[in-house]
C-alpha cells in the first residue's frame, strides 16, 4: 500500500511540474524573441458602432485613425504606443500590411472607396481626397485626408514612429504585402498591381502592372512566384467617398515574373461542389507550403446564418476551388497558418457573439476542430514565428487578444491582452528592429 501511495504522490508531483511549465515565467506577456506588432486602426468603423445618449448611431466622426506599435520580447513588459492622425487606414481590405524584413519600416495603404453606410458619416473639415492635397501637405506630421488614395511609410526605429514618406496613387490601393524576397512590396489597387522598394526612407516605384479585374484582396505564395486575388470591379467609375456599383467578385491567379505581374487564369469552383462565390467573397490567405489558399466566402456578418470557407488547390496547373468547409462562422474575415503546417485559424465577424475557428489542415479533407469565443468583428490575425502565441485583433474593442498554443492543435485564451487604437483593422508582425 505504501508503494501505491508513493507512486500516487510521484504522479501528482510530475503533473504539478508539467502544469508549472505552462505558466508564464513573468507576470506579463513575453515572446521568445524580440518582435514588433503593427496594428492599423480605422476611426470610421469604430464610429459606426458608437451611440448617442438616445442610443442612435453617432454619425459625427470623432474617432481618429491611428496605428499602434507593440514591442514584445523575452524579458520586458509589452511596449505599446498609439499614434493618431498621421496615417489614414480604412477597414475595407485584407487585414494585413507590409513590414520590412528587418522590422524597421511599416507600410499602410488607404483608399477612398466607401460602402453606402459609411457615406452617412459626417467628417471633420479639412482635406479629404487626393484633389484637396498639396505637395507640401504630404510632408506634414499630421495627415487626416480620409478619402485619399495614399500609402504611408512609417519608421518603426524612431521613438515617435513618424510617417517618413507618403505617396498618392491615382487608383484605389486596397492592400499592401511584403514580397518573400524581403526587398520588394506589392500594392494591389483597383487598376494596377504596383511593386515598390524602400530607398533612403522613401518608397520608390519599381513597376506597375495593369489589370482589368477590379479591387484586389490578394496573397503571395511563399516562393514569391505567384499571387492569388479575389477581385471585384465596379460597373461605373470609382470616385472617392462613393460606393460604386460592384460586380460579383472573381478569383484570379497571377504570375510574378521579375517585376511584372501577369494574369494566368480564373480560379473557379469545381462543378461538383455545392457552394458559390457571393457578392461579399473577399479575403484570402495562402498556406505556408504554398499548396492551398483559404478564401472567405462572405467577409461580413449577417446575424442570421453562417458562411463557408472555400479551399483552392494551388498545386494544379490552373488552380481550382476543390473543397470547402460549410457553415464555418457568421462571416469570415482572415486566416493564420501555424508554423507546424497542421493548424490554421479563421476569424469570425460576429459583432456581439463572435468566434475564431480552429482548422486541421493536415487532414483530408480539411476539417473544423473547434471554435472559441473572441471579441467582436475580428480582423488581423498572426502567429508568432515560433508558433507559441496567436494574436487576434478586434475592430470594436480596442484590443488584440492573445492565445497560447499547446501542442499541435490546442489554443488557450490568455487573460492578458494588448490595447490598440479603436477601430483595429489590420495586423502585421515582424522582428524588432535592432540597429
Report each predicted region and the residues it spans.
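Predominantly soluble domains enriched in secretory-pathway, periplasmic, or organellar proteins
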Residues: 22-435
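Bacterial N-terminal signal peptides
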Residues: 7-17
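Positively charged n-region of N-terminal signal peptides that target proteins for export
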Residues: 1-7
Amino acid at each position: 500500500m505504501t508503494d501505491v501511495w508513493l507512486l500516487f504522490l510521484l504522479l501528482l508531483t510530475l503533473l504539478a511540474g508539467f502544469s508549472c511549465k505552462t505558466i508564464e515565467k513573468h507576470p506579463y506577456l513575453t515572446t521568445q524573441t524580440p518582435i514588433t506588432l503593427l496594428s492599423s486602426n480605422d476611426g470610421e468603423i469604430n464610429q459606426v458602432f458608437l451611440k448617442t445618449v438616445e442610443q442612435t448611431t453617432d454619425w459625427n466622426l470623432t474617432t481618429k485613425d491611428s496605428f499602434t506599435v507593440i514591442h514584445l520580447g523575452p524579458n520586458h513588459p509589452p511596449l505599446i504606443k498609439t499614434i493618431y492622425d498621421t496615417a489614414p487606414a480604412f477597414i475595407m481590405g485584407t487585414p494585413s500590411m507590409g513590414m520590412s524584413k528587418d522590422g524597421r519600416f511599416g507600410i499602410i495603404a488607404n483608399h477612398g472607396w466607401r460602402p453606402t453606410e459609411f457615406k452617412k458619416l459626417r467628417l471633420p473639415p479639412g482635406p479629404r481626397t487626393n484633389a484637396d492635397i498639396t505637395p507640401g501637405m504630404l510632408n506634414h506630421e499630421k495627415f487626416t485626408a480620409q478619402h485619399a488614395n495614399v500609402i504611408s511609410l512609417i519608421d518603426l526605429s524612431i521613438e515617435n514612429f513618424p510617417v517618413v514618406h507618403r505617396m498618392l496613387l491615382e487608383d484605389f490601393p486596397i492592400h499592401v504585402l511584403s514580397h518573400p524576397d524581403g526587398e520588394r512590396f506589392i500594392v494591389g489597387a483597383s487598376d494596377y498591381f504596383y511593386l515598390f522598394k524602400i530607398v533612403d526612407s522613401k518608397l520608390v516605384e519599381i513597376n506597375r502592372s495593369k489589370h482589368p479585374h477590379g479591387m484586389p484582396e490578394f496573397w503571395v505564395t511563399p516562393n514569391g512566384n505567384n499571387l492569388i486575388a479575389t477581385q471585384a470591379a465596379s460597373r461605373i467609375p470609382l470616385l472617392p467617398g462613393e460606393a460604386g456599383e460592384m460586380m460579383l467578385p472573381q478569383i484570379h491567379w497571377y504570375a510574378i515574373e521579375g517585376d511584372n505581374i501577369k494574369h494566368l487564369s480564373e480560379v473557379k469552383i469545381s462543378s461538383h461542389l455545392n457552394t458559390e462565390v457571393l457578392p461579399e467573397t473577399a479575403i484570402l490567405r495562402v498556406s505556408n507550403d504554398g499548396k492551398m489558399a483559404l478564401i472567405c466566402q462572405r467577409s461580413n456578418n449577417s446575424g442570421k446564418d453562417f458562411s463557408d470557407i472555400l479551399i483552392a488547390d494551388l498545386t494544379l496547373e490552373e488552380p481550382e476551388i476543390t473543397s470547402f468547409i460549410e457553415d464555418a462562422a457568421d462571416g469570415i474575415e482572415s486566416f493564420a497558418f501555424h508554423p507546424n503546417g497542421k493548424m490554421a485559424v479563421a476569424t469570425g465577424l460576429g459583432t456581439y457573439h463572435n468566434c475564431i475557428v480552429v482548422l486541421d489542415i493536415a487532414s483530408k479533407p480539411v476539417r473544423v476542430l473547434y471554435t472559441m469565443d473572441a471579441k467582436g468583428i475580428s480582423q488581423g490575425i498572426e502567429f508568432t514565428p515560433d508558433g507559441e502565441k496567436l494574436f487576434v485583433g478586434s475592430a470594436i474593442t480596442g484590443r488584440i487578444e492573445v492565445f497560447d498554443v499547446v501542442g499541435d492543435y490546442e489554443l488557450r485564451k490568455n487573460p492578458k491582452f494588448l490595447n490598440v487604437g479603436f477601430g483595429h483593422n489590420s495586423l502585421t508582425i515582424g522582428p524588432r528592429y535592432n540597429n
